[in-house]
Curated annotation (Swiss-Prot):
Classification via Gene3D superfamilies: Flagellar transcriptional activator FlhD
Protein's name according to its UniProt entry: Flagellar transcriptional regulator FlhD
Superkingdom of the organism of origin: Bacteria
Keywords carried by this UniProt record: Activator, Bacterial flagellum biogenesis, Cytoplasm, Disulfide bond, DNA-binding, Transcription, Transcription regulation
Biological source species: Nitrosomonas europaea (strain ATCC 19718 / CIP 103999 / KCTC 2705 / NBRC 14298)
Domain remark text: The C-terminal region contains a putative helix-turn-helix (HTH) motif, suggesting that this region may bind DNA.
Chief location bin: cytoplasm
Gene Ontology molecular function, alphabetical: DNA binding
Coiled coil stretches, renumbered: none
GO BP of this protein: bacterial-type flagellum assembly; positive regulation of DNA-templated transcription; regulation of bacterial-type flagellum assembly
Length: 105
């Protein structure tokens, strides 16, 4: 996979992520902020972005979304194949809810 193809893939992922984030925020702001791991300032910015701004942001050479966990325990919980999947997901959600929302530096 060449550099240009990787950049195209990043652009696609970014645009999909931004569009999904906007849709989620418009439908249920509080739940979206929780699921996206963002604070109100970032939510306000995302909702107000025009199509032109979305495309400009998506064209960045870095991914705009990232893993919300640095803890191997959460990764392990999310990937485990235990029978009670709902309980496992709830446990991971509780652990991730304790993580701070992202701030713009």
């Amino acid at each position: 996979m060449g550099t240009n193809q990787i950049l195209d893939e990043i652009r696609e992922v970014n645009l999909s992520y931004l569009l999904l984030a906007q849709q989620m925020l418009r439908e249920d702001r509080i739940a979206a902020m929780y699921r996206l791991g963002i604070d109100e300032d970032i939510a306000d910015i995302l909702v107000k972005l025009t199509n032109s701004q979305l495309l400009k942001m998506a064209g960045s050479n870095m991914l705009l979304c990232r893993f919300r966990f640095d803890d191997s325990l959460i990764a392990e919980i999310l990937t485990s194949h235990k029978q009670d999947r709902a309980l496992t997901q709830s446990h991971a959600a509780i652990l991730m809810a304790g993580l701070p929302a992202e701030k713009i530096s």
